[in-house]
Structures are given as structure tokens and as C-alpha cells.
From Swiss-Prot:
EC number: 4.-.-.-
Segments passing through the bilayer: none
Lineage: Eukaryota, Viridiplantae, Streptophyta, Embryophyta, Tracheophyta
UniProt-recorded name of the protein: Hydrolase 3
Keyword rRNA-binding in annotation: no
Keyword terms of this UniProt record: Alkaloid metabolism, Lyase
Gene: HL3
Active site: 172, 267
Length: 321
């Protein structure tokens, strides 16, 4: 084997990293271009730059003539999952889900395109998602006249966004990003004094040690993604960003939102999620906690044409008020 083909990380069928720094992403869904008035849902979407490092796909549900002058829409900022190292806000796997979520919730969607590991190891994704959230918040109290002065602002958010109903969401590592963003939002102010009303953590990615044999596999594949994404993490897999129950972890009572929906599915991660929920309850956090315990698998949520997937989306969107 040539030295250039020597691998340092190989997790088929998803990703392979070579000693010379090359990365092969072996499994990615197709890119979906921007579009207006999707024939299936009526949703429109476009891609916008936020900075030289961060961009986002913004979604607008179908707006009737009557709704043009009615109350504004909730804002849903989403951080996608896939191991911190795979997929994209612009690819069909997460795009299709968000399109249907936005249509069902009647909300503006902002799906963040953050930098991926291992080329950009953590905490890059955390910083990118915080920057994207601050950009969204910077639109508060603006009107269309602001667009002439600020070329980096988006008219959909200005015209239709209700900043009293700002929500975050994320799946798996995206749910972990939500966790870390909420902790930061509890300490630092968002632009314009905007507050996060609620957040959804679907299948949140944590590495909390359990006594369950069912969770033994966490020592292997599940932990590999963290080691790939943050190889120099202080404390390794006991870093507070991935294990919120370690001794030096930030106080969960400082979560910067008023409402939280945590979703579990029927697999080995359920025990870990239950431990996190227990820690959150014991912390004294004053918000409203809702738990969705699905008798389904992780990927069922993203099968948007099935009844199971549709029902899961309805359950999650019912949280957006």
C-alpha cells in the first residue's frame, strides 16, 4: 500500500481519513438547489452567506394573501447532525426533512451550513452555529428600509420572522450543538436582546457512561465520531461539551431557553438520553420540559413520505407555538 493510501480513520460506509490529510466521504445525499414554491409543499428556499465561513439555507412556508398582513411566523434555527463530519444543509437528507418541518410548523427555517470535521475540528462547528444564531438575531426590529443599508440582512426574516418565538433544533450531533449553544446563550446576550423561547433536541449526541450492557457499543463506533471531530478535546470523551454530567461541566440550570423538547428513539442511546434528562431535572432549570419517547428508529424521522415519519414530524412541530 502506498503511503498516500494509508488510513488513520475508517468507518465504512461513511467516511475514510488518510494519513496525508485527504478525506473521503463515502456516503452523501444529493445536492438540492434553491427553489421557489415547491410543488409538493409550497415552501420556498434560498441559500445565503453569513460570513466567509458560515452560510445557511432559509425556508419560507407558503404565505397566503391573507397571511401577508397577519401575525409573523416562528423562527426555527436548525443544526444538522451526521457525526460533525458528514452531510450538509444543502443536501437532500436534511433538506427534505426541514422542508416538511417548515411546511407543517408554518415557521421560517434557517438551516445552518457549518464547517465539518476533520478538516475543521471542533469547536469550529459550535462557533459557526453561534455566529449563525447571532446573525439571525441581528434582524430584530429591522424593516425593509434596512436592506438598503445592510446588504447582509435577509428580507424573509425581516418581513415574516417573529423574534418572540425563536426556536433552535438539531438531531444527534446537531442536538449536541443545541445543548452547547443554549449554555452559551445563558451566559452571553444575543444581538438586540433576543431570547430563545424553545429548543428541540432530537436524539441528542452525548457520551454519558451508563451501567447498561445495551449501551456498550458507545465505547466503539459512537465514540469514534467525537474523537474524529475533536481529537484534542480536553478530557477526551469526558469533555463537558459531550458529557454534560462530568464534574466540571457547566450548570444545566443556566440553559438559555424557556421550553425544551427532548426526543428519544428505540435504540441503545435511550439510556444516555434518560441520564441527561435526569441531570437536567436535578439542576434546577426553571424551564418547561417536554419529552417525546418515540417507538421508532432514528432514521424514521427523515422518511417524510411514511406515516411514521409524518407522525414524528407532527409531534415535533406541535412544540412550535
Amino acid at each position: 500500500m502506498a503511503s498516500s493510501d494509508e488510513t488513520i480513520f475508517d468507518l465504512p460506509p461513511y467516511i475514510r481519513v488518510f494519513k496525508d490529510g485527504r478525506v473521503e466521504r463515502l456516503h452523501s445525499s444529493p445536492y438540492v438547489p434553491p427553489s421557489l414554491n415547491d410543488p409538493e409543499t409550497g415552501v420556498s428556499w434560498k441559500d445565503v452567506p453569513i460570513s466567509s465561513k458560515v452560510s445557511a439555507r432559509i425556508y419560507l412556508p407558503k404565505i397566503s394573501d391573507q397571511q401577508e398582513n397577519e401575525e409573523k411566523l416562528p423562527i426555527f434555527v436548525y443544526f444538522h447532525g451526521a457525526g460533525f463530519c458528514l452531510e450538509s444543509a444543502f443536501r437532500s437528507f436534511f433538506h427534505t426533512f426541514i422542508k416538511h418541518f417548515v411546511s407543517e410548523a408554518k415557521a421560517i427555517g434557517v438551516s445552518v451550513e457549518y464547517r465539518l470535521a476533520p478538516e475543521h475540528p471542533l469547536p469550529a462547528a459550535y462557533e459557526d452555529c453561534w455566529e449563525a444564531l447571532q446573525w439571525v438575531a441581528s434582524h430584530v426590529r429591522l424593516d425593509n428600509s434596512s436592506l438598503k443599508r445592510s446588504m447582509d440582512k435577509d428580507p424573509w426574516i425581516i418581513n415574516y420572522g417573529d423574534f418572540d418565538r425563536l426556536y433552535l433544533g438539531g438531531d444527534s450531533p446537531g442536538g449536541n450543538i443545541v445543548h452547547n449553544v443554549l449554555l452559551r446563550a445563558g451566559k452571553e446576550k444575543l444581538n438586540g436582546g433576543v431570547k430563545i423561547l424553545g429548543a428541540i433536541q432530537y436524539y441528542p449526541y452525548f457520551l454519558i457512561r451508563t451501567s447498561s450492557k445495551q449501551s456498550d457499543y458507545m465505547e466503539n463506533d459512537y465514540r469514534c465520531y467525537w474523537k474524529l471531530a475533536y481529537p484534542n478535546a480536553p478530557g477526551g470523551t469526558d469533555n463537558p461539551m459531550i458529557n454534560p454530567t462530568v464534574e466540571n461541566a457547566p450548570d444545566l440550570a443556566g440553559y438559555g431557553c424557556s421550553r425544551l423538547l427532548i426526543s428519544m428513539v428505540a435504540d441503545e442511546t435511550r439510556d444516555i438520553t434518560l441520564l441527561f434528562i435526569e441531570a437536567l431535572k436535578k439542576s434546577g432549570w426553571k424551564g418547561q420540559l417536554d419529552v417525546a419517547d418515540f417507538e421508532a428508529e432514528f432514521f424514521d424521522l427523515f422518511q417524510t413520505q411514511t406515516e411514521v415519519g409524518k407522525n414524528m414530524i407532527r409531534r415535533l412541530t406541535s412544540f412550535i407555538k
